[in-house]
Amino acid sequence: VVSVAEEFFFFEATDNMRVYVDDGRPFIKRAGIRDQIYDYIVLDAFSGDYIPEHMLTREFLDEVRAIMNEDSVLVANTFSTSRLYDHESVTYQRAFGEFFNFKLPSTGNRIIVAQLEPLPPRAELVNRAQQFSDSLSKYGIPILEYPSRLSTRVDWDMSRRQLTDQYSPGNLLREK
């Protein structure tokens, strides 16, 4: 992932950041044991063929919460077109409360943005997008469109069971 980011997205690690490539759940658990706190956590462990079910559960999200502070942000790249959607959404909502859903109509993906504190108001998101607009436009990233696509609307079945270490049939639910 890092080499792809460097080659195609001009990513460069700096002295102000640390990048780790590791199995997510053991890494998160070790970080919690060491009382480490992270500002920005990216969860992008899913492929079209397989979902690591142990990274979908309430227990895992509680471990993620333990390494966050009030300013930290969790960004999870996941799916929007399977039976898993309702279960996963209920699980995130119970772990974080309200979260942002970012979906593009042309894909089956969604990005979940969650934090411990209440989500920022849309006007703040628009202001932040404007700050980055010039630098990102040269890469074809229409960041000014994104704040309007962030939704907190509950579009899932709230009666669905949350995913836990004891109940996580993610790969079965992934089937359409």
Named regions from a protein language model:
Residues T14-N16, D71, F96-E98, K138-G140:
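A generic structural signal for alpha->beta connector loops
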